[in-house]
Amino acid sequence: MSNQKALVIFSGGQDSTTCLIQAIQTYGRENVQAITFRYGQRHAVELERAEWIAQDLGVSQTVLDLSLMRQITHNALMDETAAIETADNGVPNTFVDGRNALFLLYAAIFAKGQGIRHIIAGVCETDFSGYPDCRGVFVKSMNVTLNLAMDYDFQIHTPLMYLTKAQTWALADEMGVLDYIREQTHTCYKGIVGGCRECPSCILRERGLAECLESKKAV
């Protein structure tokens, strides 16, 4: 796919970094761009990690300001004083209403202006934390909507959609970057460098890594 370009929605976390590295290997570094969103997330370390990784991998990164979301929605991912909890309906209060819809919309607007058709997102429904906008049906719906809205042939790729977290770690291992993902990416909801090992995101990450490493030992 050396003649095609790709845009990766990039947060600096495990999943999006795995997708970014896979895109570089698939499309070629010169054909890959990253887009990152500042939406009022509670910790600056996420943005700092994303910037560092993009520079380290030699990928052009664009950061868009969507902090207006603070004016219209409230959740624990954007309020550092809020405790992280799961509601009665099973959806954690870290869920940001409309976030992935906005990310895909703005990514598509940017991509079309750059002549890019391939948009890559690291969302996953297998181990997803109860977020409705991480489901395959949502992404497929957005793909159709964006194509109709802009009269453009976008192809939204979600390479991790049906992988468990252990399988995502295994993919990183296959690409030769497991240690890089482990040491350089940031996933913690509490903004603790290296992870707090207590929040849902850290627990999912560590459990998946343990399963992956155990599987390697068994081979």
Curated annotation (Swiss-Prot):
GO terms for molecular function: ATP binding; ligase activity, forming carbon-nitrogen bonds; zinc ion binding. CDD domains: QueC-like (cd01995). Its EC number is 6.3.4.20. GO terms for biological process: queuosine biosynthetic process. ATP binds at F10, S11, G12, G13, Q14, D15, S16, T17, T18, C19, L20. Binds 1 zinc ion per subunit. It catalyses: 7-carboxy-7-deazaguanine + NH4(+) + ATP = 7-cyano-7-deazaguanine + ADP + phosphate + H2O + H(+). Pathway: Purine metabolism; 7-cyano-7-deazaguanine biosynthesis. Zn(2+) binds at C188, C196, C199, C202. Pfam families: QueC. Its cofactor is Zn(2+). The keyword Isomerase does not apply. Keywords: ATP-binding, Ligase, Metal-binding, Nucleotide-binding, Queuosine biosynthesis, Zinc. InterPro entries: QueC, Rossmann-like_a/b/a_fold. Belongs to the QueC family. HAMAP family: QueC. Catalyzes the ATP-dependent conversion of 7-carboxy-7-deazaguanine (CDG) to 7-cyano-7-deazaguanine (preQ(0)). This is 7-cyano-7-deazaguanine synthase. The lineage of its organism: Bacteria, Pseudomonadati, Pseudomonadota, Betaproteobacteria, Neisseriales. The gene is queC.
